[in-house]
């Protein structure tokens, strides 16, 4: 007789499909992951606030403008933030 050369798609047709593993991951989620996210969120909230800008140092290898940008006045980057991003000449005055 000819032997069928195929294998079945499932290795086990009955039984528990990872019940103990699912309980382990559920326990790790509620005991480890969620409190860790809560502590990190609390840490970010407590340290949020206004930060002073560092002193501008005109390094010659940064903020090089070989040609103007094609938007605005040509000196500001596309997502320029005047509170954080300096121009080649220094920070903008508020």
Curated annotation (Swiss-Prot):
Residues 1-20 are annotated as: Disordered. One of its GO terms (biological process) is mitochondrial electron transport, cytochrome c to oxygen. Residues 10-21 are mitochondrial matrix. Pathway: Energy metabolism; oxidative phosphorylation. PROSITE patterns: COX6A. One of its GO terms (cellular component) is mitochondrial inner membrane. The keyword Disulfide bond does not apply. The lineage of its organism: Eukaryota, Metazoa, Chordata, Craniata, Vertebrata. This is Cytochrome c oxidase subunit 6A2, mitochondrial. The gene is Cox6a2.
């Amino acid at each position: 007789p000819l032997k069928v050369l195929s294998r079945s798609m499932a290795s086990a047709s009955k039984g528990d499909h990872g019940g103990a593993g699912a309980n382990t991951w559920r326990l790790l989620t509620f005991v480890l992951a969620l409190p860790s996210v809560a502590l990190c969120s609390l840490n970010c909230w407590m340290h949020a606030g206004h930060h002073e800008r560092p002193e501008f140092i005109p390094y010659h290898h940064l903020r090089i403008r070989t040609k103007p940008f094609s938007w605005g006045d040509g000196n500001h980057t596309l997502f320029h933030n005047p509170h954080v991003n300096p121009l080649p000449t220094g920070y903008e005055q508020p």
